[in-house]
Every structure is written in structure tokens, then in C-alpha cells.
Amino acid sequence: MDGKKCSVWMFLPLVFTLFTSAGLWIVYFIAVEDDKILPLNSAERKPGVKHAPYISIAGDDPPASCVFSQVMNMAAFLALVVAVLRFIQLKPKVLNPWLNISGLVALCLASFGMTLLGNFQLTNDEEIHNVGTSLTFGFGTLTCWIQAALTLKVNIKNEGRRVGIPRVILSASITLCVVLYFILMAQSIHMYAARVQWGLVMCFLSYFGTFAVEFRHYRYEIVCSEYQENFLSFSESLSEASEYQTDQV
């Protein structure tokens, strides 16, 4: 990969992946240090420790909850930006826009879910927290499958298969983790369920990192223009330009 030919926008999904994963692991280590949760590699419960290392439980009490809220808010914002840029990237390349629109809506709802589970801790408002978890995991999984399909269909720079196949594998892994998570939760096998949850989140974050491959080919600009009350249509502008040129002649 030639760094001189790569857009700086490729770093956005990488920053999202690295920042969010680092933030969540900081939350985990704070909670372990405070004896709020068991370490992921624990075989048995320690005296005085009541909870399995679920992410929501790790970020339930301060100071870990403060870090958790900030991480999830920033992650939601970055995910929303990625969603919009991805939609703009694919818009001129897809014939039927419904799949691209569905991907945008799904990722926006997943981002909204991140803010809910980050700002409404489990013990403070369990119902809203669980709604946020469902939105994040549910629409996040849907987003992965939609983007994998779009990747193979659009085939940007003939890299569709090279990027699409890993995304299909990650999407299948995420789906499997979601199913296993709920099965283990239903059977109260909490240590294994917590490990599956961490694996699920890391797969999500890895998936987002793959958008760097396609973002490196694109440059995005924000155009700002002064508002004019007497806005001229395109035809009127051409007419004025032609009159000006005639006067000059």
C-alpha cells in the first residue's frame, strides 16, 4: 500500500477501532482492580467478588462507569460519521439504493443504542440499558451483513472479494457469538457468556477497522457557501454570464 496515494480518511475507522477497544479494556482493568468483576481467565469466583466480567457490569460503578460512558459516546459519534461517509461513498455506485439506505439506518440505530447503554448504567435503569444493548447488537449485526453484501456487489477498485470475504467471515462470527451469548445467558453459564460477549465486541470493532481499506481511495470535502437571498437558477446564471461576455466583446 502506497502511503502517498492513501486518503487520510482511512484512519477514521482505525481510530474508531483502536480507541474503542482500548477504552473498553481500560474499563475492564479498572473494574477488576476494584474487585467489581472477575478476571476473564478466572475459573472460580473470588471471595468478595460477585459478578462475571460482563462489559455492562464492568462499567456499572464509578470510576469505571465514567470512562465507559465517555468511550461509548465517542464510539457512537465516530460510528455515525463512518455510517454517513460509507453511505456517501456507495451512493453513486449502487443501482438500487434501498440496501445502502438500510445500511445507513441500521448503523445509525446501532450508534443510538451505544449512547443508551453507555449513559444508562445497568443498575440505574436496566430497561433502557437493555434496549440500548439490543439496538447495538441487533442492528450492529444487521449492519455487518448489509455492508458485506454491498462490498461484494459494488466491488470498489476490484477489491470486493478481498475485503468482502473477510467481512462475511466476521459477520458469521458475530452472528454465532450473539446466538451463543443468549444461549449461555439463558443457562446461567455466566463466565463463558461474558467471554463470548468480549469476543463479540472485538469482532465488531475489527469489522469497523476494515472500512479503512475502501476509505483510503476517497477524499471527502465540506463545501461552505454564503447564503444569497436572490438565488439565481443555473439557467439565469448562464444568461448573466453570456451577457457579461457580450459586453466585454
From Swiss-Prot:
Cytoplasmic side: 1-9, 86-97, 152-168, 214-249
Transmembrane parts of this sequence: 10-30, 65-85, 98-118, 131-151, 169-189, 193-213
Pfam family, one: Frag1
BP-aspect Gene Ontology terms: cellular response to mechanical stimulus; proprioception
GO CC annotations, alphabetized: lysosomal membrane; plasma membrane
Subcellular location: Cell membrane; Lysosome membrane
Main subcellular localisation: membrane
Molecular-function GO terms, alphabetical: mechanosensitive monoatomic cation channel activity
Keywords, sorted A to Z: Cell membrane, Lysosome, Membrane, Transmembrane, Transmembrane helix
Catalysed reaction, written as an equation: Ca(2+)(in) = Ca(2+)(out); Na(+)(in) = Na(+)(out); K(+)(in) = K(+)(out); Mg(2+)(in) = Mg(2+)(out)
Stretches in topological domain Extracellular: 31-64, 119-130, 190-192
Further facts: Tentonin comes from the Greek 'tentono' meaning to stretch.
PANTHER family: FASTING-INDUCIBLE INTEGRAL MEMBRANE PROTEIN TM6P1-RELATED, TRANSMEMBRANE PROTEIN 150C
Protein family: Belongs to the DRAM/TMEM150 family.
Function according to Swiss-Prot or TrEMBL: Nonselective cationic channel with high permeability to Ca(2+). Component of a mechanosensitive cation channel, confers mechanically activated (MA) currents with slow inactivation kinetics. May contribute to proprioception.
Protein name: Transmembrane protein 150C
Species this chain originates from: Homo sapiens
UniProt lineage: Eukaryota, Metazoa, Chordata, Craniata, Vertebrata
Gene: TMEM150C
